[in-house]
């Protein structure tokens, strides 16, 4: 039973690694200019979320 569990965990970890590598490759493929725009968009969303949470708490 323990062997099967370890095998399942190993598959999960390897799948995560592949997914992470795809994300890194995509980020490099997009290029610095679009990457900066995406970064600003993500940052804006985070800031907006923080503001909304702050207003809700008040």
UniProtKB/Swiss-Prot annotation:
Location of this chain's protein in the cell: Cell membrane; Membrane; Perikaryon; Cell projection, Growth cone
Membrane topology, as annotated, equals: Single-pass type I membrane protein
Note the site residues: Cleavage: 13-14
MF GO annotations: metal ion binding
| Amino acids binding Cu(2+) | 12, 16, 19-20
Q: Which Pfam families match?
A: Beta-APP
- Entry similarity comment: Belongs to the APP family.
- Protein name per Swiss-Prot or TrEMBL: Amyloid-beta precursor protein
**What are the leading ranks of the lineage?**
Eukaryota, Metazoa, Chordata, Craniata, Vertebrata
């Amino acid at each position: 039973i323990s062997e099967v569990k370890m095998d399942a965990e190993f598959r999960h970890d390897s799948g995560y690694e592949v997914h992470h590598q795809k994300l890194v490759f995509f980020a490099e493929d997009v290029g610095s200019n679009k990457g900066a725009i995406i970064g600003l968009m993500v940052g804006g969303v985070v800031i907006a979320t923080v503001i909304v949470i702050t207003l809700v708490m008040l």
